[in-house]
């Protein structure tokens, strides 16, 4: 049948959209194939539903599929389906008009009808993905015949102001979209889309879990027997797995399948530590399959490190590294989230900040934290492995996630003076606290060895008080952000004044303490003047037993390590002076007191004060402001003793 070819103009909005599609909307030109396959999958879903509802529609639904065909010589790529197809009017309405989506209309009708049997996985809700083809094609041809009708429609456009449309005979049911591809251009990210390898790569990345088979004719060389020539054969091959493990019941998935899937999406060589399947129903429906890895990735603490969660919408891949679905401190979690309905931008590549995303994020976070809690209780060995790999990252949440802070404190573990081998929970620490103890004592520093040998530790060790030993950089941050645990506040052993005595001890030592304050008043005043550039105060210590001196901060001052971290990151840090504490029972301090009383004008006493301050600074792992001066004074002092 010969028919008239109509030439029509795009609406003004559509012309603007085409320009946006080609130059602005999509960050990756490869996305066009995802859009075409999504539309084809949508058409197959529609046909299956229509055949179920309309008993007068006699169509074969036994082999519904998507087919990809390439012609390297003609530089064409065709995506074909045997789905519902479109009529002439629908082609004009859906393709010639901006963002008019047949799928969106169908879903609205189904929702109004409340037909439970029609809960189909329809994904063509965006309405304009078809236009993405003009990013890679100079001309696009659509051939489509609606199921149950005899006449087909051919639509063709070069992406300019007009398109042509005509009625044709002898077209198969369904739709085929043929792209006349632009030349390859590496700078413009135009690849060889007739390459079998490239097509398989894109299908694997974007459409591997589409429920329908995606087929492609592939050439294979069959070696000849004897001296004959090798034979080249063409066979149809299904190039997608169709295995959306997250959509299956946990009982129907084997452990090996989970492991294989994890290695596929995480690009991992080892097995996951934990598998977390999840299905949420209600206001926001989604399915998720998450994994806790066995080992931390090398870039876990790098600024540009990637998150591990992929986002799908109705089995269609949307994006890698979807940081909006998981808090940053859980960035090590790998997996897939498949949402039923999300507000996306027109390219499906950027999520809009809306309550759906926030709701999904809350559910995922709660599920992961509950899993870690169960791991700690039921599988302590696996928990220890997890904490060694990811504990530093989890503790970041103590600062940022106030809603889940109590849960995070509960699943955290810390080194302490209670055991050299085992970590402790805060719950166990509190259970071991002494009668009358109202604070959780902690020390921060670069290593356990440095902390245990610190002068600040002496009184706590002598009196049997347990101290948390915090050696991760993040520890310097969260202890200042978390007010308390189980009604017990956190107290640094290197800040403020320490009161470890019982009421009986205080009464017994009260007169002795008053006598010491009186005896050392002159020395303390003199040293405060002599070291006024370095310290804000010199006082007697209640935390020292064997060391002559130590340096402490005010109760709410920033630790030296935290100051160094801020300076290293380029942030301004105000200059703060700390407090020098003296041990009133140490021979060096008592000798200095006596010497000061006898010859307070002796210049050597000033050097002794500087040496005492420098020794205290080094003992806590600090840095001398003038190491050369310190070593010169120390060498001169040692020379006089030889």
Swiss-Prot record:
Residues 1-348 are annotated as: A. Residues 349-564 are annotated as: B. The keyword Cytoplasm applies. Residues 565-642 are annotated as: C. It comes from the Bacteria. Disulfide bonds: none annotated. One of its GO terms (molecular function) is unfolded protein binding. HAMAP family: HSP90 (MF_00505). PANTHER family: HEAT SHOCK PROTEIN 90 FAMILY MEMBER. Homodimer. This is Chaperone protein HtpG. It comes from Rhodococcus jostii (strain RHA1). The lineage of its organism: Bacteria, Bacillati, Actinomycetota, Actinomycetes, Mycobacteriales. The gene is htpG.
């Amino acid at each position: 049948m010969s028919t008239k070819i109509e030439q029509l103009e795009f609406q003004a909005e559509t012309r603007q959209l085409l320009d946006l599609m080609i130059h602005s909307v999509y960050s990756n030109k490869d996305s066009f194939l995802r859009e075409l396959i999504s539309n084809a999958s949508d058409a197959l879903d529609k046909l299956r539903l229509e055949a179920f509802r309309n008993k007068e529609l006699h169509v074969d639904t036994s082999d519904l599929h998507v087919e990809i065909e390439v012609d390297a010589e003609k530089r064409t790529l065709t995506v074909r389906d045997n789905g519902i197809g479109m009529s002439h009017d629908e082609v004009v309405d859906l393709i010639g008009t901006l963002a008019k989506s047949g799928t969106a209309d169908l879903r609205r009708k189904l929702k109004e009808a409340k037909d439970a049997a029609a809960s189909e996985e329809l994904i063509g809700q965006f309405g304009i993905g078809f236009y993405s083809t003009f990013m890679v094609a100079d001309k696009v041809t659509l051939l489509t015949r609606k199921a149950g009708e005899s006449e087909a429609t051919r639509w063709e456009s070069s992406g300019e102001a007009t398109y042509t449309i005509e009625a044709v005979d002898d077209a198969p049911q369904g739709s085929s979209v043929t792209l006349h591809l632009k030349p390859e251009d590496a700078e413009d990210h135009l690849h060889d889309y007739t390459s079998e390898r490239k097509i398989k790569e894109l299908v694997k990345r974007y459409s591997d879990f589409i429920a329908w088979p995606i087929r492609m004719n592939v050439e294979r060389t069959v070696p000849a027997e004897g001296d004959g020539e090798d034979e080249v054969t063409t066979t149809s091959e299904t190039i997608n797995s169709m295995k959306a493990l997250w959509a299956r019941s946990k009982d129907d998935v084997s452990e090996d399948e989970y492991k294989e899937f994890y290695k596929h999406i995480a690009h991992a060589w080892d097995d996951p530590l934990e598998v977390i399947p999840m299905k949420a129903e209600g206001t926001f429906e989604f399915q998720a399959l998450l994994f806790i890895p066995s080992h931390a990735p090398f870039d876990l603490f790098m600024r540009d490190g990637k998150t591990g969660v992929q986002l799908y919408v109705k089995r269609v891949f949307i994006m890698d590294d979807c940081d909006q679905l998981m808090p940053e401190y859980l960035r090590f979690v790998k997996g897939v989230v498949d949402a039923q309905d999300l507000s996306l931008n027109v390219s499906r590549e950027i999520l809009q900040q809306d309550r759906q995303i926030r709701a999904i994020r809350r559910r995922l976070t709660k599920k992961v934290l509950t899993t870690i809690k169960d791991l700690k209780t039921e599988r302590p060995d696996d928990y220890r492995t997890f904490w060694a790999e990811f504990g530093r990252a989890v503790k970041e949440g103590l600062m940022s996630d106030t809603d889940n802070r109590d849960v995070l404190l509960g699943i955290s573990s810390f080194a302490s003076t209670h055991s050299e081998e085992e970590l402790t929970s805060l719950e166990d620490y509190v259970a071991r606290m002494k009668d009358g103890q109202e604070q959780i004592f902690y020390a921060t520093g670069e290593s356990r060895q440095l902390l245990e040998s610190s002068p600040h530790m002496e009184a706590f060790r002598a009196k049997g008080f347990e101290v948390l030993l915090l050696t991760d950089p993040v520890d310097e941050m969260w202890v200042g952000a978390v007010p308390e645990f189980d009604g017990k506040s956190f107290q640094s052993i290197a800040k403020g004044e320490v009161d470890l005595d019982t009421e009986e001890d205080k009464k017994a030592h009260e007169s002795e303490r008053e006598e010491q304050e009186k005896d050392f008043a002159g020395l303390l005043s003199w040293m405060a003047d002599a070291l006024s550039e370095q310290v804000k105060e010199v006082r007697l210590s209640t935390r020292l037993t064997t060391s002559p001196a130590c340096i402490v901060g005010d109760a709410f001052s920033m630790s030296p390590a935290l100051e160094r971290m801020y300076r290293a990151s380029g942030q301004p840090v105000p200059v703060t002076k700390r407090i020098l504490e003296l041990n009133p029972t140490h021979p060096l301090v008592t000798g200095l007191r006596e010497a000061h009383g006898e010859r307070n004008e002796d210049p050597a006493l000033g050097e002794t004060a500087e040496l005492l301050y420098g020794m205290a600074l080094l003992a806590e792992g600090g840095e001398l402001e003038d190491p050369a001066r310190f070593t010169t004074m120390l060498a001169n002092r040692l020379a006089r003793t030889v």
